[in-house]
Every structure is written in structure tokens, then in C-alpha cells.
Amino acid sequence: MSTPTAYEHDADGSKFIPATQRPDGTWRKPRRIKEGYVPQEEVPLYESKGKQFRARQNDGLPVGLTPEIVAQAQKKKGQRSTIQPIPGMIITVEKKKKKKKTVTGVEEAAEKLAKCEIQEPTLPSQSVPTESISQSDPTKRLKNLRKKLREIEFLEEKIKAGLLKSPDKDQKEKMSKKNEILNEIDILKNSIL
């Protein structure tokens, strides 16, 4: 909480909070306050009745437990700690130590990497498209290929009309595959019929 605000009185006798400077350097305007006003910072926090009741109990004992019983329990506790099972024997409690792993994290990672096998990706051969044709539905594949052919023809028309002067690398690749797509369409038509 902040420090209590100092009020000032003007010539009329009314109270006001003087202008203050913010952390960023700007100034707050002086504020006129009514009689009996308590600033938000100075309003005491709300405490429930239960909290107030617990605050009044200084001993912190559970309900119904008398201080005499507590004193007796503390005496017994103190006596237990001073009594040793065998005179002259010192009892030390050792904490359980965690076993250190013989293999460190770096060595584990090195072992895992040694077990891994690296294989070069194989390039798809010409036989792969024919296998994919047989796997998928031929009518869907035919429809897809016709769509690609329309896109290629649309690109060619754009180039002829002069709308597309320099096609991208992807567009050039697409147009170079026109003959392959036409061949595939013919193969699919023959397989369907």
C-alpha cells in the first residue's frame, strides 16, 4: 500500500489532493475531494468474520484444545528428543542419496545416434505413376489430369496473348509435363473402356 495522501486546503477551505508526478514524468491534476472521502489506497481490506475471529485468537490452537494440554505435549516431545536408546550413542539420520547414472546424457545420445541408420531418399521412377494410377480410382485420376491439362492450356494462352511475359520456374515445369499428362489421359481412357 502507498503512504497516506497529504491533503491541502485552498482559500475557500475545501480539501484537495495536490498535483503529483507520474513515473513517466507527466503530472496529475490536483483533485478536489468532498468531506469524508477516503482514497482507495487507504480503504482497509475486507475481512470476513471468520478471518477476523482467527486473527483474534492469538494462540493459534484448535478449538477445544486448552493451553495446558499443549504444554504437556511439548514437554513429552522435548523429553523424547533428549532420551537416547543407548547411552553415549549418537544417532544421525542419513538422507537417501540418489544413485548416479553411469551413463551420462551425452553418452546416451551418442549411443542412440550410432544405432540409427541413414538412408538416401530414392527418386521416384517412371513406374511409380503407373502404380498410382492402378491404386486410385481411374475416373478420379482422369478428372484430375484433365484439370491439370486445362491449367496448362490456360498458361499457354496467357503467354501467347502477352499477359504473362516471363513464366515462373513452376509454371515452366507445369508446361513441360503436358505431353506426360496427355499420355496418361490416353492410357486411362483405354483402361476405362
From Swiss-Prot:
GO biological process entries: exon-exon junction complex disassembly; nuclear-transcribed mRNA catabolic process, nonsense-mediated decay
InterPro entries, alphabetized: PYM1, WIBG_mago-bd, WIBG_N_sf
Polar residues bias (residue ranges): 122-137
GO molecular function: RNA binding
Cellular compartment(s): Cytoplasm; Nucleus
Pfam families per UniProt: Mago-bind
Positions in coiled-coil regions: 139-192
SUPFAM superfamilies: Pym (Within the bgcn gene intron protein, WIBG), N-terminal domain
Keyword annotations from UniProtKB, A to Z: Coiled coil, Cytoplasm, Nucleus
Residue span of region Disordered: 1-27, 118-142
GO cellular component, one term: exon-exon junction complex
Top-level taxon of the source organism: Eukaryota
Family the entry assigns: Belongs to the pym family.
Record note on quaternary structure: Interacts (via N-terminus) with mago and tsu/Y14; the interaction is direct.
Stated role: Regulator of the exon junction complex (EJC), a multiprotein complex that associates immediately upstream of the exon-exon junction on mRNAs and serves as a positional landmarks for the intron exon structure of genes and directs post-transcriptional processes in the cytoplasm such as mRNA export, nonsense-mediated mRNA decay (NMD) or translation.
Listed name of the protein: Partner of Y14 and mago
Organism: Bombyx mori
Gene coding for it: Pym
